[in-house]
Swiss-Prot record:
Keyword list, A-Z: ATP-binding, Cell shape, Cell wall biogenesis/degradation, Cytoplasm, Ligase, Magnesium, Manganese, Metal-binding, Nucleotide-binding, Peptidoglycan synthesis
Gene: ddl
Cofactor note: Binds 2 magnesium or manganese ions per subunit.
Superkingdom in the source lineage: Bacteria
Similarity comment: Belongs to the D-alanine--D-alanine ligase family.
Residues binding Mg(2+) 1, per UniProt: D257, E270
Positions contributing to Mg(2+) 2 binding: E270, N272
Annotated protein name in UniProt: D-alanine--D-alanine ligase
Pathway assigned in UniProt: Cell wall biogenesis; peptidoglycan biosynthesis
Cofactor needs: Mg(2+); Mn(2+)
Reaction it catalyzes: 2 D-alanine + ATP = D-alanyl-D-alanine + ADP + phosphate + H(+)
Binding, ATP: 134-189
The enzyme's E.C. designation: 6.3.2.4
Source organism (scientific name): Pectobacterium atrosepticum (strain SCRI 1043 / ATCC BAA-672) (Erwinia carotovora subsp. atroseptica)
Gene Ontology annotations for the cellular component aspect, listed alphabetically: cytosol
Length: 306
């Protein structure tokens, strides 16, 4: 049977616009390699008919809910279509930052101190009692929805008086929210391709933190690859990335994000099971450092589909 690849993009999540950019870049890379690939916007096209339309493989370029949360992966498993990235369980788990942290904690991997809060607790708890839950974390804080990507709904809190507004913003996007200790050091990210850990990247946003604008819109964010770590630090970070990736049963490809705190210790932030593939994206940057062109990278990811 002749290979016909569906590049799933767009969708209906808060990350739709980024997904459209990722998907078009992936599509161009696959076509450059001579692969019969077609863009499929899951907002408009029923994925249940992919097999009927003659597709034999799926490259998932969707971000956020409905694309990397296990839902789509379950449908593709049912259809018997090979797809890129992690399976149902790993996709569902890593979409939820709280549950991912809990798994990492259980196996002894480093995560920043945090408090989890659900909407019911938030609505039922008196304001002063609510604020008292977070005092042991110190200031500043970072507030984020548990199940959003691309820093959607995320806020930095410098004083406790700013916390209610930050919680309101996070609860606009999810019923579960994380309030974490602010880590003051630089952010690093490590891409994984099959069983290979790619070189780390150090991220230096122009603003307060690596938010949506810094990730996708700003040309002022600086990226360093090589990241400037010593060989010993690079090896330790690579080992930590792979341990975190395997602890949540990821496969195929992905990206693990870290913060380096003022105590020179790395803390895990999250795993991305369907990382961005835009002109600002990090996995292609790390792959270039290993000598892979963008087209070679997307072909390799497709070859890892299961």
């Amino acid at each position: 049977m002749t290979e016909k690849v569906a590049v799933l993009l767009g969708g209906t999540s808060a990350e739709r616009e980024v997904s459209l950019l990722s998907g078009q870049a992936v599509l161009a890379g696959l076509k450059e390699a001579g692969i019969n690939a077609h863009a499929v916007d899951t907002r408009d096209f029923p994925v249940t008919t992919l097999k009927e339309e003659g597709f034999t493989n799926v490259f998932i370029a969707l971000h956020g809910r409905g694309g990397e949360d296990g839902t789509l992966q379950g449908v593709l498993e049912f259809l018997g279509l090979p797809y890129t990235g992690s399976g149902v369980m790993a996709s569902a788990l890593t979409m939820d930052k709280l549950r991912t942290k809990q798994v990492w904690q259980a196996v002894g991997l480093p995560v920043s101190p945090y408090v989890a809060l659900d909407r019911r607790q938030y609505l039922d708890t008196e304001a002063n009692t609510l604020l008292a839950q977070f005092t042991h974390l110190g200031l500043p804080l970072i507030v984020k929805p548990s199940r959003e990507g691309s820093s959607v709904g995320m806020s930095k809190v410098n004083t406790l008086s700013d916390l209610p507004a930050a919680l309101e913003e996070a609860f606009r996007h999810d019923d579960d929210v994380l309030v974490e200790k602010w880590l003051s050091g630089p952010e690093y990210t490590v891409a994984i391709l099959g069983d290979e850990v790619l070189p780390s990247i150090r991220i230096q946003p122009a603003g307060t933190f690596y938010d949506y604008e810094a990730k996708y819109l700003s040309d002022d964010t600086q990226y360093f690859c090589p990241s400037g770590l010593s060989d010993e630090q690079e090896q330790a970070l690579a080992a930590l990335a792979m341990a975190a990736y395997r602890a949540v049963d990821c496969s195929g490809w992905g990206r693990v994000d870290f913060m380096l705190d003022s105590d020179d210790a790395f803390y895990l932030l999250e795993v991305n099971t369907s990382p961005g593939m835009t002109s600002h994206s990090l996995v292609p940057m790390a792959a270039r450092q290993r000598g892979l062109t963008f087209s070679q990278l997307v072909v390799k990811i497709l070859e890892l589909a299961g």
